[in-house]
């Protein structure tokens, strides 16, 4: 059976499952009413892209990233009938073993069914010979990880962190309500559109708590995670014992991601897996700026002044000269302070005991996100450089797509990860 033969093309809505009741008495002092969020329907132009499965309708512009253990190339492309910029993920299915094929199949199916503004959408999926093409909206700001590398090497401001985490946790809450564990929450799986919309990607790592119509309290699926993912994983997932893990494992990853956004570095990145597990198990939750859990470096990166980080690669924008940016606008003080509310959120997420961590729904009601009621979606745009999202801007010359004959670059050199 083909990878694409297993799901219905009617785009049936998945009915949300009732989440388990959680005990949150220990965090009530930090909770407020949950903010609301509206979502508009896709534009007519986007609807045309949704229906386009003709490979000749897409002009590949430039590769903007790698993913899926370096088996997938991610390209900026233009949908020629409408002029819409899109993202295309191209994977050679012949290079995928059975486990990877199942992961791809799962990601395609679940993205097809999920309908939430904070979950990355697959507009169209089709095959070109043995190559799988996945068409998604172009996220002009790329990933939060890319923003860190290019503009915020010493970490983001608390206001920007709040905007990014709020969208990510809303998407995560939707997944949890539908009985799914993401298992790969991190900055490189948080994408930002040119309109300031934050979405979660990385659905190939997702696992369902529902089996045979029953929602289980824990799962015992322990895949061979890439070492690049392990710093974000919870202690219970790394332990791989008889207790298993559940959706609270993702909450731990949210806490690590918050530390990543605050410091500009990935906690535990240079540690051996055993040392990492011991470090995560040994004591109380970590501070977002606890230097003992971050890789040591003799020198820190400086804010880039060479071009706008648009999500298509800084070198492309430098050569084309389409934008410039005022570095003062993106300046982050080297001596940063964070509010008690932010420290509280991180500490709650990083509790060793999963039962002591809040649910995603409760996390959205944390006082740290209270200001999101007053802030509009445009507020995140005021904290970022101008986005590269106008189809009228000239792009590098394109060539017809052909099957690659050379080896791909190392995944570690890529800023985008899907």
From Swiss-Prot:
Spell out the subcellular localization from the entry.
Answer: Nucleus; Cytoplasm
Spell out the molecular function terms from Gene Ontology. Answer: ATP binding; protein serine/threonine kinase activator activity
Q: Where does ATP bind?
A: 64-72, 89
Tell me which Pfam families the record gives.
Pkinase
Q: Which InterPro entries match?
A: Kinase-like_dom_sf, Prot_kinase_dom, STRAD_A/B-like
Annotated keywords = ATP-binding, Cell cycle, Cytoplasm, Nucleotide-binding, Nucleus
UniProt cross-references to PROSITE patterns, sorted A to Z: PROTEIN_KINASE_DOM (PS50011)
Tissue specificity is: Highly expressed in heart, skeletal muscle, testis, liver and colon.
Q: What is its main location?
A: nucleus
Q: SUPFAM superfamilies in the record, alphabetically?
A: Protein kinase-like (PK-like) (SSF56112)
Which Gene Ontology terms describe the biological processes this protein takes part in?
activation of protein kinase activity; cell morphogenesis; JNK cascade; negative regulation of extrinsic apoptotic signaling pathway in absence of ligand; protein export from nucleus
* GO CC list: aggresome; cytoplasm; cytosol; nucleus; serine/threonine protein kinase complex
Question: What is said about its interaction partners and assembly?
Answer: Component of a trimeric complex composed of STK11/LKB1, STRAD (STRADA or STRADB) and CAB39/MO25 (CAB39/MO25alpha or CAB39L/MO25beta): the complex tethers STK11/LKB1 in the cytoplasm and stimulates its catalytic activity. Interacts with BIRC4/XIAP. These two proteins are likely to coexist in a complex with TAK1, TRAF6, TAB1 and TAB2.
- What does this chain do? Pseudokinase which, in complex with CAB39/MO25 (CAB39/MO25alpha or CAB39L/MO25beta), binds to and activates STK11/LKB1. Adopts a closed conformation typical of active protein kinases and binds STK11/LKB1 as a pseudosubstrate, promoting conformational change of STK11/LKB1 in an active conformation.
Q: Domain comment, in the record's words?
A: The protein kinase domain is predicted to be catalytically inactive.
Protein family per UniProt? Belongs to the protein kinase superfamily. STE Ser/Thr protein kinase family. STE20 subfamily.
Recorded hits in PANTHER family, A to Z, give:
SERINE/THREONINE-PROTEIN KINASE FRAY2 (PTHR48014), STE20-RELATED KINASE ADAPTER PROTEIN BETA (PTHR48014:SF13)
The protein depicted here goes by the name STE20-related kinase adapter protein beta
Its source organism is Homo sapiens
